[in-house]
Amino acid sequence: MDKKTSRLRRAIRARKKIQELGVNRLVVHRTPRHIYAQVINPEAQVVAAASTVEKAVKEQLKSTGNVDAAKAVGKFVAERAIEKGVTSVAFDRSGFKYHGRVAALADAAREAGLQF
């Protein structure tokens, strides 16, 4: 089993537990160059999203693949979710380790007002 398959298996296991709770989830996906975040409701509809691909986020950054970029994305996604009335979420790290960019995004979202 390769690295990606292991990560996806971890992600599926975590998502099933979150689905049982029936709450909104903050989903994170990262690549070496970019990081993406979405708030998804229990009906699988995207409520809010932000990523380093977006022009509004990219303009504020020097590089899109580092911890500072993840913090910016976390702040943007939290602000957009709160505008839509979502204040509480479950954190879905998509099988990635809670470290580095993933942890930075989560911390920034918490500081911006999301609760998880």
Curated annotation (Swiss-Prot):
Keyword entries, A-Z: Ribonucleoprotein, Ribosomal protein, RNA-binding, rRNA-binding
A GO cellular-component term linked to this record: cytosolic large ribosomal subunit
Pfam families named among the record's database cross-references: Ribosomal_L18p (PF00861)
GO molecular function: 5S rRNA binding; structural constituent of ribosome
Signal peptide: none
Gene Ontology BP annotations: translation
Function as written in the Swiss-Prot or TrEMBL entry: This is one of the proteins that bind and probably mediate the attachment of the 5S RNA into the large ribosomal subunit, where it forms part of the central protuberance.
Family named by the database record: Belongs to the universal ribosomal protein uL18 family.
Complex formation: Part of the 50S ribosomal subunit; part of the 5S rRNA/L5/L18/L25 subcomplex. Contacts the 5S and 23S rRNAs.
Descriptive protein name: Large ribosomal subunit protein uL18
Organism: Shewanella sp. (strain W3-18-1)
Gene from which this protein is expressed: rplR
